[in-house]
Amino acid sequence: MFALCDKLRNAQAAGTLYSDKVMRMDRRICPFLRTLRGWALVVGLLAGCASEHAAKPASAPLHRDAAALAVIAEADLKRGDCRGASENYARAATAGDVQVARQATQVAMACEHLPAAWQAAQRWRSLAPNDREANALYAAIALKLYRTAEARAAINDFWRAEEQLDAAAGTAPGTPQSSPVPDAAAAPPVLTARAQQRATRSMGELTALLLEESDAPAVLTAMSGALEPTANSPDTFTLLGELALAAYDGQRAQGYAQRALQLDPQDLAALRVLARAYVMRGDAPQAVATARRAQARDATRGGFELAEVLASLDRSEEAHQQLEQLRAGGAPQAEVDRRLALLACNSGDMKEARQRFTELLASGEGNDAAQLYLADIAARDGDPDGAIAAYRRLYDSSVALSARSRAAALLLDRSARTEALALLDDYAADHPEEELDLTLAKARLLADHGEADAGLALLSTALERHPQHPSIEYDRAVILEQAGRVHESVEALERMVNERPDDPTVLNALGYTLADHTLELPHAEGLIRRALAVTPDNPAAVDSLGWVQFRQGDARGAAGTLAHAYSLGHDPEIAAHWGEALWVSGQQAEARRVWAAALARDPDSKPLKATIKRLIPDAH
């Protein structure tokens, strides 16, 4: 059941309804993120920090206690005590200079010690209020703690620093890009355009960092508050539109895209945002018409966008035809084949998907993701040995954590516990920078295979290393519910709501948990509606609303809400809820149709199969 809550927490990773631009943001390493890429980098960074400080004299004499604490922190880090290093560096920062505060912030962020990171970042920003990097990391930590007002202030300061850089170059973002004086020298307009491009790139990199550390709704709240009042370029409005799509707010995305198109009616990125906003809002005719406008603007890129929109609208045959037309028109064959493989996979046609992914690999155009799909297809087709063998080939690839986690799940299914956990432990030994993600993955795996207590024990240990970490606290609440400790789960989520009252993930999780156990239904509905106010088109939150309506006895009304939720995100658990609402309201034939279609997409969904078995005991 909490798969939905996990999906809400990771909304920016769901790529069906927003453009590739935001998906690429998550993979980009912006300049002020390069030193945060994990434990191994921190060790190297600290090893060289003495020489760095020698080369760059401090702006003020370093307090003796700060220097001593910094030395202790380095020793902590080198012997693997990330918490000790974070806390000692944070203490050093309180009396240290800018360099110490910067180092303290980076170490604590890499160690996922949020209280220490927040303490150090506040100090750094107070010492260097106009430093772009200080403001960027301050905003990232603030958003991770759901301090959106503080994040917005730092983003404003970041943007002012951008303006100062451009002013120093003789121009500023927003300056008209053509001279009102005929025959004026060409240099200023060129410089202005270059400055605008640099500012856009810089804000894209900041957005990438913020999305890496927080959820899209929080990033949208902070970024829009900082950028929207003075926005005057298509790029800025398109960026905000992308964020609105990632935050599942179709109406805001539509508005931003339309404002971008008022400035440049031919802007392809804005047309893509607008088309997907219409998809999210359920306006299929406008979505297709807008995608065709994009196709008229750029036959290949716009043509791919049209295929994507058709696929999102469940018009798979038309999407298939569109992709074949692109092939005939000279579009890159490998890209056409990749999209056809994904289309087949998402439509439940595993035979075609397997064939196309295999052909991609044979032609040399495949990648690790294609191999991962083939392994997933083998697992889905009931061939665990073949799937494990395929996952094994990816154990040291770019998708290693996914491959190892899925192989571990299959091994746990056959009670090979030691071998399963070794897959993750071995990877952790070689990749300590991913320790937290690995711990969370292991705890979820154990809980999903009947070992909730073991998963909770892992999370308790993780909280000692990463105190007050919201991801650990959230997963702990999830697993408490799985273990049947519902009241403890509710208490944990209530504490998180008190700390993060506008976080839609936590609001929805608490509301859904109460509804699923028929507890405090009016309160549950209120919580879910608060989540929907922030992320109105999120399928998980819309599903929760439908489920609380069902629990309140309105099966027919719930069916309509759940149908909308399923149109937003084809999650099998939403289909289970939708079918049950239809069944109870007397529409058994329609319920069977919904379940059959969902099973074709996700034949191994435990919630879906459990619902069908409960309502149709003799179903096979």
Q: Which sequence ranges carry the predicted segments?
A:
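Bacterial N-terminal signal peptides that target proteins for export
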Residues: 26-39
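Alpha-solenoid helical repeat scaffolds
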Residues: 58-78, 86-620
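Short, Lys/Arg-enriched N-terminal segments with co-localized hydrophobic residues
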Residues: 18-24
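C-terminal motif of bacterial Sec signal peptides marking the signal peptidase cleavage site
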Residues: 46-48
